[in-house]
Amino acid sequence: TAAISGGIVWVPSNPSMQEKGISDSREDALAYFRSLDHGEMNDDSLEAFVDEGANALQFLTERGALDLHILNGYPDYYLDNPGAKSDGGRALDNALFDFTSLGDWSDKVYTGGEIVRMMLLETPLGGGSGIVDPEEMKRRVQGDLRGWGQALIGRLLKAALDRDIEILLETTARKLELLDGRIVGATVTHGGVETAIHARRGVVLATGGFEWDKELKTTFLRGPLTSPASPPTNTGDG
């Protein structure tokens, strides 16, 4: 889903805000979250996101996995809600990313049939004109420079490949492995074989949603969802 989205990263009190002296507070961020969650998120999850979000961005940026820039004046979506910021800062855009650096992995990132050669901040949505010099656009096309969600996922993928992190395609997550009340891994199906993968530090759930799985939609969503805008592979299993 992220690969065909605008790729905006939304984090309160993020490092870019701190560098530019844009004010934000833990209290405002939590108030904004709680005005939107319909009482369905627990405080531990909300507070962990607000308290550690900036640190997570700093960690990934220092390792080349992110290159983010403030979308000047890009407001929170629900401005009438408590804690909302009207002057921007929390929303971050991705610098263009060179997909040729991915080698054979460059065609593994889903495009949905469209590749954007601009940063969001260059478009009217991000405060820009939406116009790029033809010679510059030619350079971007020839160099396979991509923006938006493609840049976000491409850069994360490159950081993983640079560290020889094994990436399994066409792999379905089946269940989480528990030991003494702790999640220690996951059982997956890869190449028709069910395999247990053990984790030393934790398991990150980043499966992209489940809006194409009828059973999960019926179980977990409050109402019908008939026309998802995401890839049909979003079935909740990775």
Annotate each PLM feature:
Residues D37-N42, T187-I197:
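A structured beta-alpha segment of the ubiquitous adenosine-cofactor-binding alpha/beta core
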Residues T1-A31, L216-F220, L225:
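Conserved N-terminal glycine-rich FAD pyrophosphate-binding loop of Rossmann-like flavoproteins
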Residues V50-G191:
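Conserved redox-cofactor binding core of oxidoreductases
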